[in-house]
Structures are given as structure tokens and as C-alpha cells.
From Swiss-Prot:
It comes from Streptococcus agalactiae serotype V (strain ATCC BAA-611 / 2603 V/R). Catalyzes the transfer of an acyl group from acyl-phosphate (acyl-PO(4)) to glycerol-3-phosphate (G3P) to form lysophosphatidic acid (LPA). This enzyme utilizes acyl-phosphate as fatty acyl donor, but not acyl-CoA or acyl-ACP. The lineage of its organism: Bacteria, Bacillati, Bacillota, Bacilli, Lactobacillales. GO terms for biological process: phospholipid biosynthetic process. It holds the Pfam family G3P_acyltransf. GO terms for cellular component: plasma membrane. Keywords: Cell membrane, Lipid biosynthesis, Lipid metabolism, Membrane, Phospholipid biosynthesis, Phospholipid metabolism, Transferase, Transmembrane, Transmembrane helix. Pathway: Lipid metabolism; phospholipid metabolism. This is Glycerol-3-phosphate acyltransferase. Its EC number is 2.3.1.275.
Amino acid sequence: MNIIIMIIIAYLLGSIQTGLWIGKYFYQVNLRQHGSGNTGTTNTFRILGVKAGIVTLTIDILKGTLATLIPIILGITTVSPFFIGFFAIIGHTFPIFAQFKGGKAVATSAGVLLGFAPSFFLYLLVIFLLTLYLFSMISLSSITVAVVGILSVLIFPLVGFILTDYDWIFTTVVILMALTIIIRHQDNIKRIRKRQENLVPFGLNLSKQKNK
């Protein structure tokens, strides 16, 4: 019963649609009708500005971290915190508070990793920032980190780098997280291939996107 309650709490935390609610209640803007139509951090930055974007990013990360820490806070050791945290990602992607139409789960996934495996989170953060600087695309950086994350959880335990041994729950959840991110970025992948993806106003833009 405790596990079911924790899953429900984690899902409800993930279902909090920060960008959507900030847009509606503070800016009178429905993010679904602007930009990419996504309710996540990137579109919030683009449509509502830096302040709203930072708040959205922070809350979306923290809700993943908090969901992961629920078993630890409650002193429950019969279930992996990472497993519970995954339900915040499901909530963010399919939120009950927003007709099950959510974001791409990048920030919330980062929060889950931060709460359970901070060293692995920092490693992927470096990959994300490096890719962002080289190619000037949030979407490509997110996809790259997802792919690298899958490869890393499979390879690192073999060499004892960051991950010292295999944890089948951690490995499985990381792969599911990464696949969710990749699948949710299908439209972005199409735009990248056409060189029409949205860019951030810094970096090298090595792929020469036209930013239409």
C-alpha cells in the first residue's frame, strides 16, 4: 500500500504543469497556442521570457527530485527511490491536470537523476552543455544526452566509471527515460534534419540551422 501511495504522489507531482500554469495565471498566455505548443521549459523561455523560464526549469527539476526522495523521506527501503521518481516523469508527460498532454520530460528526468545519482546527473549535464554550445539547440542537446545516457548505463559499470556496478532498476529506468525523451522529440528531429530547428542565441550552430 505504501508503494502505491508513493507512486500516486510522484505522479501527481509530475503532473504539475509549471509553464502552462505560469503562462495562464501570470501572463494570460496559453503556451499551447504559441511557439512549439509545448508546455515545458524551452517554450516557456521562448514565449514568456527568462524569469518565467527559470522558474519553470527550477520547479520541473525539483518535482522530479522530490518524487525520487519520497521513499527516503518516509524511511521506506523496500522500493528503489529511482523507481518512484520515474512516475513523476510519467506524470509530467501525461499529466492528469492538463488532459494528459504534457511536456518532453527533460527537466523532470534531470531532477530524478539529481535525486538518485547526482554524479551521473553532473556527467550528463556536462554533455548537455557542451552539445548546446556546439550546436545551439536545446532539442539536439536533450536527444544527445538521452542517447549518451543509454550507452553510459550499459558501458560504465563494465569499466567502473561513475557507475560501479549494474543496478537493473537504474539501468531499466534510465533507458525508459531516455526513450521517452527521444520519442517526445520526433518533431524536433524532423526540423533538425531540414535545418529548420529553433536555436538559442549563443553557441556555434555547427549544423547551420536556419532557425525558421
